[in-house]
Amino acid sequence: MKVKICGVTHPEDAEYAALLGADYIGVIFAEKSKRKTSLSMAKSIADTTKRLGAEPVGVFVEQTTDQIIAICEQTGIKTIQLHSTFPLGALENLLRDYSIIYAISVRENGDVCHPQSLPPKVIPLYDTEKGGTGKQFNWKAFSLPKDTFWMLAGGLNPKNIEEAVATLHPNGVDVATGVEFPNKTRKDPDLLKAFILSAKKSGEKI
């Protein structure tokens, strides 16, 4: 079970998550996000993440291909997360140099908003229509992806991660709000530990 801790805003949070076994540490560059980090902070988080054997992920929403590449070159990030507004035709150019996670929106009722046919190397991440809200979609009504590595996001937290994994059998899980202090962007060490350990343990059962 791969675990991604998203919206990390401080190297200390990245360090603790990586030491606990997180595989991916997400750094957000979306302009409208409360978790957006500066380039210097993102590089510090990325350096810390790589030093501890995890993979930093740059999360982009409205940037162009050239802007994404420029940010990645300045921060040393080699894995990027894109959203459904990013044109599929531009993925192949980025795949030459970067690993890609592609967020696909799911409505509350479990329906995929805009089903996408992605290149084989791209990892689909199924999330609620507005990611980072702490809300989940209807897991039982969701049509499970077949024969592909995929990740789950949307309203996950230490209390429901075991149920989520048992119900949907994802290959990876992604959390932001569910491991944060209330009304803050910093991660809560206790919630981080509970989530990561539970996700890893749950993954061993599927």
Curated annotation (Swiss-Prot):
<dbReference type="GO" id="GO:0004640">
    <property type="term" value="F:phosphoribosylanthranilate isomerase activity"/>
</dbReference>
<dbReference type="InterPro" id="IPR013785">
    <property type="entry name" value="Aldolase_TIM"/>
</dbReference>
<keyword id="KW-0413">Isomerase</keyword>
<keyword id="KW-0057">Aromatic amino acid biosynthesis</keyword>
<keyword id="KW-0028">Amino-acid biosynthesis</keyword>
<dbReference type="InterPro" id="IPR044643">
    <property type="entry name" value="TrpF_fam"/>
</dbReference>
<dbReference type="InterPro" id="IPR001240">
    <property type="entry name" value="PRAI_dom"/>
</dbReference>
<dbReference type="InterPro" id="IPR011060">
    <property type="entry name" value="RibuloseP-bd_barrel"/>
</dbReference>
<keyword id="KW-0822">Tryptophan biosynthesis</keyword>
<comment type="pathway">
    <text>Amino-acid biosynthesis; L-tryptophan biosynthesis; L-tryptophan from chorismate: step 3/5.</text>
</comment>
<comment type="similarity">
    <text>Belongs to the TrpF family.</text>
</comment>
<protein>
    <recommendedName>
        <fullName>N-(5'-phosphoribosyl)anthranilate isomerase</fullName>
        <ecNumber>5.3.1.24</ecNumber>
    </recommendedName>
</protein>
<dbReference type="GO" id="GO:0000162">
    <property type="term" value="P:L-tryptophan biosynthetic process"/>
</dbReference>
<dbReference type="Pfam" id="PF00697">
    <property type="entry name" value="PRAI"/>
</dbReference>
